[in-house]
Amino acid sequence: VMLSAETAVGAFPVEVVSAMADAALGAEQHPVARTSRYRADREFSSPQEAIALSAMYGANHFPEVRGLACLTERGTTPTMMSRLSSGLPIFALSRRPDTLQRLALCRGVIPLFFDFAAFSPEDLEARTVEFLVDGGFLSRGDFILMTMGSTQGEAGKTDLMKILPVK
């Protein structure tokens, strides 16, 4: 959705932007907008892309999943995820403010500060789920699809995907 100069700087700019936001949100609720054929006929270019798009496919086809938790350094994986239409939130969890700022522009992505490097690999899944429950994003009994890299703290190394119950 794009504004022309006349509507963007007219007498009622706030009302115009509000009406356009309502129209965009309404369009995204249409069933056609919730399914995607993005890259359906092409091969993946990297393991990271395979995980990102497979996670979206899995989450969209498993009704108990209430969102995706993506542990990220640079934000590449949640950016790839946002290219697929979905009614599910993509929680981009990062310890880097610059990454979170960039991800704020991606459709369906909720950027959240989370210093996952502060946790041991054994505690990471439980702490991530706990963080999202405490933030009011998830409830007990939900499922969350989580992506991360097996080598914690390295950018561009997303290679794990898990579906976790929220206990």
Where are these regions (language model features)?
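Short beta-alpha connecting loops at secondary-structure transitions
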Residues: 1-9, 37-41, 84-88, 110-116
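Phosphate-interacting basic helix/loop segments used at nucleotide- and nucleic-acid interfaces
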Residues: 49-65, 124-136, 142
